[in-house]
Structures are given as C-alpha cells and as structure tokens.
Design a protein with these regions (language model features):
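Extended, helix-rich architectural segments
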Residues: 1-101, 107-109
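Extended amphipathic alpha-helical segments with heptad-repeat/coiled-coil character used for oligomerization
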Residues: 330, 343-358
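A preference for well-ordered globular domain cores
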Residues: 333-339
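Non-catalytic, well-ordered alpha-helical scaffold segments
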Residues: 280-284, 326-329, 333
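Extended, charged amphipathic alpha-helical segments
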Residues: 164-312, 352-358
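Glycine-rich and small/hydrophobic secondary-structure elements
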Residues: 314-327
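Extended, regular secondary-structure scaffolds
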Residues: 81-195
Length: 358
C-alpha cells in the first residue's frame, strides 16, 4: 500500500493541538511571505543581530554550532533543534520546528518521541528515510524505515534500507546502552509562555502580534494604492488636453478656466508620511504587543547604545536580549553534554557576549 504522508508513515500523530499546528504554519508563511513590510523578517533579524553582535565562543564543538540559524528558526517557529552528526568530525544540523514531528513530550515540554524525514533522489525514484526517536525506560531507541516513490509529494511503498546507497549502512533499530537525557537532539525554545493553547510547546517571538501585523499589512497595502493613485494624477484644464494623445489614468481634466486650474499635482496628505516613518511606527506597535524592550525594534536614535543598556532591568518587559542569550547558553551547554554522552570530546561552554554597540 502506498503511504501518502509522514504521520501515516510513522503510524503516529503529532501531539500538538489543531490551533497550534495552524498557528505554526501561519508563522512560517508570514515570515517567508513577499509582503511590503516584511515585519516578521525584520523582527527576527533585528533580534538575531542584537543577540550575536559580539558573540564569541571557545572550543571546536561550540564554534561549530550554527548559532544564528538555530536562533532564527527558533524565533520563527517557537523552537528549533540541533542534531549532532559525526562523519570524522562533529558538526551540527539545524532542524526547524516545521521539519520535525513531535509525538510526545514530558512535563517540561521536552520531546520524548519524535520523527524526522530525509529525502534523496536516485534516478527517477524518490527515497524518504523516516527516523523515529523514542525514549523508553530512560533509553533512546532509533528506528529507521525507507520508502520509495515516483513523486516527492508522497512516501510510496516501504523498501529495504539497502535500496538506497545513501541509507544502506543504517540499522533498522538501535537502542543506546546509556541515557542521553532525551531523544538525542538539543531543543532551543523561545522564553515566552505559550499564548496559543497554553501547552509546553514554544511559540514564535511574533506570535502575539500576528493579528496586528495582518492589519498593518492591509493598512500599508491600502496606503500604497492611494499613494500610487495620488502620485499618478495631474489636474489640468480640459482645453489643454488633446483627445487620444494623453492617458486619462495620468491626467484629470476640469471644465474651469485655465487661469484657475493650470497644472496641479494631486498630492494627498498621506504622501507626506514617509514609508520609513510608518515602518518605525509599526515596529513600535509590535514591540508593545509582544513585550520587547522599548526601542529594541522601532526607535531611531542618534546616540548608539550598548547591549547592556538595551537589556537593562528598567521597565516591565517580557522578552529581552538577555533572555534570548540565556536560552542559547542553556542549549549550548546541553549540546556539549550530548556530544560527551555520545562518546565525543568533553568541552566546557565558554561564551562571551561583549558589551557591544547596537
């Protein structure tokens, strides 16, 4: 029987609610949407730059972590995952929340049963490896299954792992002899409380502002239409126009005396509002909704500020650069501990943030 989707292939369903699944899809869609404002992209990029402005790390394992990609994907989808890979040397694969199925979590929100998929093409066939990671009695068991189809949009039929050279050396099932403290992945999650369904799953940094950003996008689209209409019209006396020679989408003729009309550019008040000024105002609105430190996104200042000044304790705000840095430090420490548990070198997380100018 042909298998159509990942949940059918794994024989399990994600443990998140429908509201959470829909919200997560909306976060990624809004981030990658080619809209005028690109507010989600702006928010994430400003935060990532602020967090890692003068980031420094010692040790090969720590420096190998793609820190910006990991945090960026966590800010978009609420959480991302680091998977250690050893191919002669240790490196890390960053997995977005949209690239992993979570079938079960513990009381702290940490996954205890997940599914990963990897696709390869050989000739006209598409091979999809389904990797399931389950914690049972404190030990991690990894199961591998391979599917082959003629379309990348479905899994197709199950085949032996040896059918694809890229996966031929993998075991069908393997259980680690000692605990890895989880599913063998490092979870990097945003520090905000889940505002979608109250569960332990991480939420996007801009999740509380999704409706506001939708309204702002609609408002900007309307202003852009009015701007184009206003910019493209010249009011002139009708006797100055020669029929059939000028486009009436540019000129508007009035039946008044030429001395009273002349040539007048239609310039509504909205043209006096620059796009940059509106965008800064929008970012300040978003700041207030998602609880960012005031001025972190939308304030234009003449004097530079240090990271310490931006993340000072004044004001009651939920998310600051310091909180995001603590989240990354925790994930980095867990990443090093995971490599050591897998038999790799033991390193200490030595991270420097500097006192950078933002």
């Amino acid at each position: 029987m042909d298998i159509l989707n990942l949940e059918q292939g794994f024989g399990a369903a994600e443990c998140c609610s429908q509201a959470m699944a829909a919200a997560r899809q909306a976060w990624f869609d809004s981030y990658y949407a080619a809209s005028v404002l690109r507010l989600p992209y702006t928010i994430v990029r400003k935060l990532v730059r602020g967090v890692f402005a003068e980031y420094g790390a010692s040790g090969e394992l720590l420096r190998a972590i793609p820190e910006r990609a990991a945090l960026e994907l966590a800010l978009i989808g609420g959480e991302s995952y680091l998977k250690p890979v050893f191919d002669g040397e240790w490196h890390w694969r960053v997995i977005p929340r949209s690239g992993i199925l979570v079938f079960a979590r513990d009381h702290a929100g940490e996954p205890t049963d997940v599914g990963l998929a990897e696709m390869r093409q050989e000739g006209r066939h598409f091979y999809t490896l389904l990797e399931r990671r389950q914690v049972q009695n404190g030990l991690l068991t990894v199961s591998n299954r391979l599917f082959r189809s003629l379309s990348e949009n479905e899994l197709g039929r199950e085949v032996p792992l040896s059918a694809c050279a890229a996966f031929a050396g993998l075991p069908e099932r393997f259980t680690y002899s000692k605990s890895l403290g989880g599913v063998g992945l490092v979870r990097l999650a945003t520090p905000m409380t889940n505002c979608i369904d109250g569960s332990g799953e991480g939420v996007s940094v801009f999740a509380p502002a999704m409706e506001l950003m939708r309204v702002l996008e609609e408002n900007e689209a309307q202003l852009e239409t009015e701007f184009r209409n206003g910019m493209s019209r010249l009011v002139v006396s009708r006797d100055m126009l020669r029929g059939g020679q000028l486009k009436d989408e540019l000129f508007v003729a009035l039946d008044e005396s030429p001395e009273n009309v002349g040539i007048t550019v239609f310039s509504p008040e909205l043209r006096q509002k620059s796009f940059i000024e509106r965008q800064q105002a929008y970012l300040r609105l978003v700041e207030n909704v998602i609880g960012l430190k005031r001025g972190l996104l939308g304030e234009v200042e003449a004097a530079p500020r240090t990271a310490t000044e931006i993340t000072s304790s004044e004001g009651e705000f939920l998310t600051t650069l310091l909180e995001l840095r603590r989240c990354f430090e925790t994930a980095a420490e867990r990443a090093l501990a995971l490599v050591a548990a897998l038999g790799g070198p033991a390193e200490r997380a030595d991270i420097s943030w500097g006192d950078n100018i933002i």
